[in-house]
Each structure stands twice: as C-alpha cells, then as structure tokens.
Swiss-Prot record:
Keywords recorded for this protein, A-Z: Cytoplasm, Gluconeogenesis, Glycolysis, Isomerase
Compartments in which it is found: Cytoplasm
Enzyme class per UniProt: isomerase
GO cellular component term, pick one: cytosol
Gene: pgi
The name this protein goes by in its record: Glucose-6-phosphate isomerase
Record: active site: 356, 387, 515
Organism domain of life: Bacteria
Main location: cytoplasm
Entry function: Catalyzes the reversible isomerization of glucose-6-phosphate to fructose-6-phosphate.
C-alpha cells in the first residue's frame, strides 16, 4: 500500500514555496558565471553510454536540497520498494505493478500473492523465442506453403504505441520482415495497410488481453475477412494469426491455435506492456537476442533506480526538476525533442506514458487535489521542430521545459549530416539558456550596416530572453540496450512524480466514460431515425451526420 501524504502539507513543499520567491529571479547566465563547476555538479552519467546534463535548469543547490527533502518526506523510498516487491500499489484495481519483473534479467524471485512470477515470465519468453525463430527463419509457412514476409500488429494504446515506437527506433537492427501497425478503428488504417500486404505471406498479431477491445477486435475481424477471401478455408486462419491475450476461449473461437497465444498478466499495465508478450512484434522485427538486450537495458536502469541515493538517481532527479516547473513555476507542458529520426515516435509513446499515468485530479484518499498533477507531453524530432514550434519555446510567453535527446554516433554515416544535426542540438540548448541581449542584437545590426532608425525598430523583435530550461540527454548510440535504459528512465520518472503528487499512476479510469457512451450511441447510428436522447449539441451532431449520409 502506498501512503497518503499530501505533498503541499510537507515541510519541504513549504520550504520550496518560500524558496521560489527568490528563485523565480534565477538567471542561468549568472548561475554559470558564478560556478565554473556547474556542469560537473549538475550532470550524471549512466554507465559508459549515457550522459544526462541538467545544469541548464533554473535550480541551485538550495532548490535541489528542498526537492530531495520532498522525495524523502513523501516516502518515495517505501513506494519504490513496494512496487518492486509486488505489492498491490495499483489500489483501485487491486493489482501489483510489475513490468519490472518482465525484464528482471537477474531472475531473482518476484512474488505476487506469495508466488514467484519469474518461471511464468521465462516460459512466455521461451515460447516467443521459439515462435519468432520459426517465422524469421522461414520455417513457419502460410496456407500456400510460402514463408512469412509481413507482420501486421493489431492493437491500440499500449498494445500499439510501445511496439511501434521500439521497432521504429531499432530499424538498424531489423531483419527482412516488414512490420505494420494498425490501431485506429477508422477503417482507413486497416484498408491502407491491407493494400500493401499479400494474404499468402502475412502474419497478423492480435494484441488484446481480453480479446474484447472494440477497436482491436473490429480490425482483427476485418483482417480475418480479408484473409479468408483469398484463403477460403477457415482452417488456414491458424497459419496467419497469433494472439497476445489471456482469453483462450475467444482466441480459439476466432480460429487461432491457442499454442500460438502468448499470455501476460493483470500486473502488466498496458502502457508498460512492450516488455511482455505485447513485444512479440519487436522480437519478430529485430530478433530475440536484441529483444533480450532491450530488456537488459531496462533492467540496468531498474537497478540504478532501486539502489542509487536520490541525490545521484537519474529518474528521481528528472522527476523532481519536473515538479519544480510544474508546481512552482506554473509550467503546463514538457517537450521531448529527440535529435534522431529513428526516435520519431518517442515523444508520442511517453505522451501516453505520462498523461495516462498522471492525468489525475483525485488523490489517493479520493479527494480532489489542490495542486497541479501531470503535465502535457509533446514533441517532434529535431531539426524538424526548429522550423515548426521552437519559435514559441524561444520567444513565447509560456515556460516549456525541454528534454533534448541525441546519439553521439549515428547509424547512418551520410556525409556531414550528423555533425550538422548535432551542431543544432548543442546550439538550441545554449540559445534557450542564454538567449541574445539587446546589446548583442544592436552590435549585429550595426555590423550588417543598418541605420540607427532601422536598428531601433528591429532590436525588440530580435532579442532572446533566454532562461528557458532544458535537460540534455546524450547517448553514445541508440542500441537495444541504451533504448531500454532510456525507456525505463522515463517510466521511473513518471512513477516518482505520481508518488509525490499522491495520486494513483497505474489506473486509467479516464478512458472509460467515452467508451461507455460510444457503446450507447453505436446502435443509434444504425438507421436514419432522428435522435433525441442526448443533449441538444450531441443530438444535433448525430442528426447532421445521418443527414450527410442520406
């Protein structure tokens, strides 16, 4: 059980509130000028391959001291221990939270209700290994005797976002199989995917724990119907469909051999499920050995998180700095900006990871909170974002803390592309931190031969205030192991913030109401009769929809 501690009632929170009165005037230029060792003091290395520089943040030693005190006063250490021990910290669903067990490469026992889950975890891994080797090696044949060339993962939310992000991030490690991901119940998503695959050589993975998820099962049945138009015999379904599920009865009724059903457990949350059987598409894309490297990387970060004092603990530090901006500076969003095209889905993945976890307005006592909880998460790869939204980050009126992520070594050594990419990576955090003064702008314009009148008119528009905070996360190279490090780092950051905010991070009741109402509305769309059972707006929209289709 997690303790119920209102963070605003702690001494540390009160100290941070008082500290903010002077800290809101903090100036990064001055902080660096005052301390030549600032980078060394406010950066951390993870192993040999990751450097996290948090020196360009609006914090000093006193800020960090109070933030670490907040972590201790809200009993973060007990919460970490409870999660890793398999206690039911997802209290509203009475479930343990053990995605960490899925990547427990030490194989030390992890108990849920007194039973070690590791034998079951290892059994599913072994089953996925054997299955994937048959498919990748060409031993698995389709209904006409041809080997599989394409894999279509049908899922939504955690059954889609994680595997899609990872397979894209690790394209340099992929084999000959072509991966496709279908999530949206909009028929266009499935229709466009099916245009590009051959029923004789396509394997579908249906990812739904209950095998009842509306979007996933709608898409799965559409894929099955399309397949049977070519194959004819329903017995052939078993050669082209596998299930990531626990509902053996429904899987068998669909036509899938339950030998090709890969299970996971109720202690695996959807947005943390890529480490489970939901990761089968990852294994089919990059091979089992690389998937194990991904698990190993995450396990390394788990060990760091569990065993490192808060003052040197990377996920804890990042979480606390995020709380400083969210709850004291009034920042409403955070941007994740990977300078690596392979990571183009990384921000979208953690948009779900963060916003579904910490988008809560009720505390662990069931009372509305009186403080801000989860931030809005967004982002795009650099340098694309520089030509889209960085304008607002640099010169807008909103404070947007940013995480910049980049590899030192590219997988594609094309001319001087990577040096140009990285020059932008380094330049952006420098520009955001230190800006450009009116004097510097004036000197620049004078050098360009502008008149005094032109200079006076232009200067205000060309000044950069700076003092925009950033973290820089430099990775030697994006590999399965370092990607595992990064994903687990952000997972634990989110967990830490939820603990301190006194909310439950592992349920997601906010997705339920819309689904319930959609199930009520669906039969109302079956005919042309006018609808009157809702509010005037919803009635008007449904009736306009029907009129457009008449």
């Amino acid at each position: 059980m997690l303790k119920n501690i209102n963070p605003t009632q702690t001494q540390a929170w009160k100290a941070l509130t008082a500290h903010f009165e002077s800290a809101q005037d903090m100036d990064l230029k001055a902080l660096f000028a005052q301390d030549s060792e600032r980078f060394a003091k406010y950066s951390a290395r993870f192993g040999q391959d990751i450097l996290v520089d948090y020196s360009k943040n609006l914090v000093n030693a006193e800020t960090m001291q109070h933030l670490f005190a907040l972590a201790k006063e809200t009993d973060l250490q007990s919460a970490i221990t409870a999660m890793f021990k398999g206690e039911a910290i997802n209290q509203t669903e009475d479930r343990a939270v053990l995605h960490t067990a899925l990547r427990n490469r030490s194989n030390s026992p992890v108990l849920v209700n007194g039973e070690d889950v590791m034998p079951a975890v290892n059994a599913v891994l072994a089953k996925m290994k054997a299955f994937s080797e048959r498919v990748i090696g060409g031993e698995w044949k389709g209904f006409t005797g041809k080997a599989i060339t394409d894999v279509v993962n049908i899922g939504i939310g955690g059954s889609d976002l994680g595997p899609y992000m990872v397979t894209e991030a690790l394209v340099p490690y992929k084999n000959h199989l072509t991966m496709h991901f279908v999530s949206n119940v909009d028929g266009t998503h499935m229709a466009e995917t099916l245009k590009n695959v051959d029923p004789e050589t396509t394997l579908f993975l249906v990812a739904s724990k209950t095998f009842t998820t509306q979007e996933t099962m709608t898409n799965a049945h559409t894929a099955r119907d399309w397949f049977l138009k070519a194959a004819g015999d329903e017995a052939h379904v078993a050669k082209h469909f596998a299930a990531l599920s626990t509902n053996g009865k429904a899987v068998a009724e669909f036509g899938i051999d339950t030998d090709n059903m890969f299970e996971f457990w109720d202690w695996v949350g959807g947005r943390y499920s890529l480490w489970s059987a939901i990761g089968l598409s990852i294994i089919l894309s990059i091979g089992y050995d690389n998937f194990v490297e991904l698990l190993a990387g995450a396990h390394e970060m788990d060990q760091h998180f569990v065993n490192t004092p808060f003052e040197s603990n990377i996920p804890v530090i990042l979480a606390l700095i995020g709380i400083w901006y969210n709850n004291f500076h009034g920042a409403e969003s955070e941007a994740i900006l990977p300078y690596d095209q392979y990571l183009h889905r990384f921000a979208a993945y953690f948009q779900q990871g963060n916003m579904e976890s910490n988008g809560k307005y009720v505390d662990r006592d069931g009372n509305p909170v009186t403080y801000q909880t989860g931030p809005i998460i967004w982002g795009e790869p650099g340098t694309n974002g520089q030509h889209a939204f960085y304008q607002l980050i640099h010169q807008g009126t909103k404070l947007i803390p940013c995480d910049f992520i980049a590899p030192a070594v590219s997988h594609n050594l094309v001319g001087d592309h990577h040096q140009k990419l990285m020059s932008n990576f380094f330049a952006q955090t420098e520009a955001l931190a230190f800006g450009k003064s009116a004097q510097a702008v004036q000197a620049e314009l004078e050098k360009a031969g502008k008149s005094a009148a032109e200079i006076a008119a232009l200067v205000p528009f060309k000044v950069f205030e700076g003092n925009r905070p950033t973290n820089s996360i430099l990775v030697k190279q994006i590999t399965p192991r370092t990607l595992g490090n990064l994903i687990a780092m952000y997972e634990h950051k989110i967990f830490v913030q939820g603990v301190i905010w006194n909310i439950f991070s592992f349920d997601q009741w906010g997705v339920e109401l819309g689904k319930q109402l959609a199930n009520q509305i669906l039969p109302e769309l079956a005919d042309s009769a006018a609808v009157t059972s809702h509010d005037s707006s919803t009635n008007g929209l449904i009736n306009a929809f029907k009129a457009f289709r008449a």
